[in-house]
Amino acid sequence: RHLAKVEVASSSLVIRSIPFPHRLFALMRFFVFGGDFLNELLSLVRKAVDKYRMIEEGDCIAVGVSGGKDSLCLLAALGELKRFYPKKFTLKAIMVDPCFFGNPTDYSEITELCRRLYIEPVIKTTQLYEIIFQVRKESNPCSMCARMRRGILHDAARAAGCNKIALGHNTDDAVETFFMNLLQGGKIGCFQPVTYLSRKDITMIRPLIYVSERQTENLSKKLNLPIIKSPCPADGNTAREQAKLFAKDLDKTYGKVYEKIIGALERRRIDGWTDEDPSKLRRKSKPGT
């Protein structure tokens, strides 16, 4: 069996065949090493998946893999979940390479991880760094980069035959987004656990919404995941980083701030969040009820 590694440079498409041998024992060692950490992650991921009905029978899900701890934990969790989840689905790992400083990113260790998880890796090479930092010289590069990466990811997922995209946004990300919307935009809001994009005809899911950044950090170390440190010049100097520090300060003062804000989003049903249990949601979705 073979996997297709897809590289897109400008408008050209190059497909290279990658051997895909069975590596059952390597896969078993990978997950046994994670121990209770992986079980805890899987429990929280399944809670989100079940509650918001993120996965349906026959889904082909593109996992957006940046190379950070969150996206790699998501890749590992969904790779394990698909082995026993009652609804059968397939996974593809899509990496959008910005080519920082004109250099392609080395994804070899991540593609090896994909082989161990029986997931097809797809790499899309772009000129994002050149466009944003050298051509346009953006004063606010993060916003533009995020928009462009999303568009590229959406198109790559559709081209790969996927109907859903899984993103690695965790509990901390949700709380930081809440504060950014409140303090910068003067509105109460957050990203949605599940979002259907009608223009792209694709659904975004966020299975890590109940997983904290501390948990993904611990698990990524325990599993020795192949994290790629971001060489982005703007890394660590963003509005989100300020929101992160603000949330941490509040948590030190008041305690359980992250859980409280997630609970408030769900109780008030803000932006698709809900506090209803999955069984009630399913009953409501049945025709004639």
PLM region descriptions:
Residues R1, P19-G35:
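N-terminal, intrinsically disordered charge-dense segments
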Residues K5-E7, D36, K284:
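Intrinsically disordered, low-complexity polyampholyte segments enriched for Lys and acidic residues
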Residues L13-I15:
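Short linear/disordered segments characteristic of secreted peptide precursors
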Residues T90-L91, D172-K252:
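Catalytic subdomain that performs nucleotidyl-dependent activation
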Residues A146-R158, V194-K200, A247, D251-E266:
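Short, basic, helix/turn surface patches
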